[in-house]
A protein has these predicted regions:
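Charged/polar low-complexity intrinsically disordered regions
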Residues: 66-69, 77-177
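N-terminal membrane-proximal hinge/A-helix region immediately C-terminal to the signal-anchor transmembrane segment
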Residues: 3-114, 422
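Conserved cytochrome P450 K-helix/beta-meander segment immediately N-terminal to the heme-binding cysteine loop
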Residues: 378-413
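Cytochrome P450 heme-thiolate monooxygenase catalytic core
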Residues: 133-293
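Central I-helix of cytochrome P450 enzymes
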Residues: 237, 261-317, 343, 377, ...
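C-terminal helix/juxtamembrane-tail motif
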Residues: 1-4, 15, 368-369, 471-492
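Cytochrome P450 heme-binding "Cys pocket" and the immediately downstream C-terminal segment
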Residues: 308, 418-419, 430, 436-473
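Conserved cytochrome P450 K-helix E-x-x-R motif and the immediately C-terminal K′/meander segment
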Residues: 42-51, 322-368, 378-383, 387
Length: 492
């Protein structure tokens, strides 16, 4: 039709503009040498490439082809003071691209960057607020361990990652979802499995060219599965929320002390709409996944260093020997804190830190020009630097306890939740992990129960090597351990 005769020309202009935009971005990034020819090399040996890039380019910036956009520019750790608190470097936008934001089924990863999630954490999961939650968390930890690890006093084999994530999911859900859902099997199945399913779907999706993502995901079984999980999650949460809203309409003074209610309060305070299922799964991603990884790896490290078990048990007995939780109880488990921080130093969840997307052109003090929309990250190698840590590749459960006892500054920087340029386990600066206080609290609390109430050792021929994928370094999901119930006289 004559009225539509302009359409081919318009499409040609749009295509030409897109090609020119991509070409211009590539030209701006050409100043950074690319360390790998294909994204498969990044996916298979990301950490090795970082070491090679550091050696080949002598600490100067280089680029990793990740298969997404222009890849990631790896910067020298010396620029951390410039990047850590500069709003022109956005961690949320970096993660959104990595996790296929905008593709149906991955909405919880968009929720990770929403203001309402950060406000719910900031307003409710403060160190002071978390201390008040220890009693219900402890009660659920006790019940979850008994149900999942059993009270069998004979050695029996379990898949470590499977049992720990189920325990952490139940304990966290007490605070996230309250009594109605914290033991709901269908909901717990979703919270336990969603992240792994989404990660697998993302892996499959990344095999395709980026421009096909929005089409091909509809036909991939892995992507269909995560979409179905979100539908089910919404169906589970909706009636609980509707019931609560009716009850609160009848009695405005009614309060629920969980994240379902915190979101309702925050949404009214901020005058925004939100998707409860997306937000709850975002909380699960930020808390359950990282807590499970840290706890699983810590248990493996302790099993390889069994001389640590009894000193840890003695500390726990001295702190909560009377069975009473106090606001300072977990703060005083300083050896346990040190053990966890050492595990996080040796095996963080990623071999890079400070992943950011540049929201406008930036020129660093050393003259490095970072174009808008480029992705950047910093090699986390400082955590294994012999100039900073003595015998950095050797596990030392007392390392951070000694640093805390050595100086006032060490007390501030050597706690598990502390962030510093020398330890990027929880990030750094304005984008440091906001949920680290709750996550660390949950891990320490569950570990107190586990260490006092169970013996644990690695199964024969257990594989404890981390699972590496790109820059990710995850606790091995195939590791098997032997556990048995201990006869412990502390009742808490």
């Amino acid at each position: 039709m004559p009225g539509n005769s302009y359409v081919p020309y318009l499409m040609a202009i749009i295509l030409l503009a897109s090609v020119m935009t991509v070409s211009l971005r590539k030209n701006k990034l050409s100043a950074f040498p690319v360390i790998n020819a294909s994204k498969n090399e990044y996916l298979m040996s990301g950490r090795a490439m970082l070491a090679r890039g550091l050696k080949e380019f002598g600490g100067k910036p280089f680029r990793v082809n990740t298969g997404l956009g222009g890849g990631v520019i790896i910067l020298n750790h010396s620029v951390m003071p410039e990047v850590r608190n500069d709003a022109r470097f956005d961690s949320t936008k970096f993660l959104l691209q990595y996790w296929q934001a905008g593709i149906p089924g991955f909405e919880p990863y968009i929720a990770l960057g929403t203001e309402i999630l950060h406000n719910v954490i900031k307003w409710n999961l403060t160190p002071t607020g978390i201390a008040k939650l220890n009693k219900p968390l402890s009660d659920e930890a006790n019940a979850a361990l008994s149900d999942i690890l059993t009270d069998d006093e004979e050695w029996h084999e379990v898949l470590l990652g499977d049992v720990i994530i189920r325990i952490v999911a139940r304990v966290s859900s007490v605070i996230f979802l309250g009594p109605e859902l914290c033991r709901n099997r269908d909901w717990l199945k979703i919270t336990v499995n969603y992240t792994n399913k989404a990660t697998n779907a993302a892996k499959v999706l990344r095999r395709w060219p980026v421009f096909l993502y929005r089409t091909v995901h509809w036909f991939l079984p892995e992507c269909r599965e995560v979409r179905a999980m979100l539908v089910e999650a919404r169906q589970i949460i909706a009636p609980i929320l509707e019931k609560r809203r009716v009850q609160k309409a009848a009695d405005p003074s009614l309060e629920y002390h969980d994240a379902l209610d915190w979101y309702e309060t925050a949404a009214k305070r901020m005058s925004v709409d939100y998707d409860p299922a997306d937000q709850q799964l975002a909380l699960s991603i930020s808390a359950i996944l990282t807590s499970n990884d840290l706890m699983s790896q810590s248990i493996m490290d302790l099993c390889k260093n069994p001389e640590m078990f009894e000193p840890l048990r003695n500390e726990i007995r001295s702190v909560i020997g009377d069975g009473q939780w106090r606001p300072t109880s977990l703060y005083n488990t300083k050896l346990l804190d040190s053990v966890l921080k050492e595990t996080l130093r040796l095996k963080p969840v990623a071999a890079v830190g400070l992943g950011r997307r540049v929201v406008e052109d930036v020129r660093l003090k050393d003259g490095t020009f970072l174009p808008q929309d480029s992705g950047i990250a910093i090699n986390a190698g400082k955590m294994w630097d012999p100039k900073i840590y003595e015998n950095p590749r050797t596990y030392d459960g007392y390392r951070f306890l000694r640093l805390r006892e050595a100086s006032e500054q060490g007390e501030k920087t050597s706690q598990l939740v502390s962030t510093s340029p020398e330890h990027l386990g929880f990030g750094l600066g304005i984008h440091a992990c906001p949920g680290r206080f709750f996550g660390a609290n949950t891990v320490k609390l569950v570990m107190c129960h586990l260490l006092l109430k169970y013996d644990i050792k690695l199964a024969e021929n257990a594989n404890t090597n981390p699972l590496e994928f790109g820059f990710s370094m995850l606790a091995n999901p195939t590791t098997k351990v032997l556990v048995r119930r201990r006869k412990e006289d502390v009742n808490f």
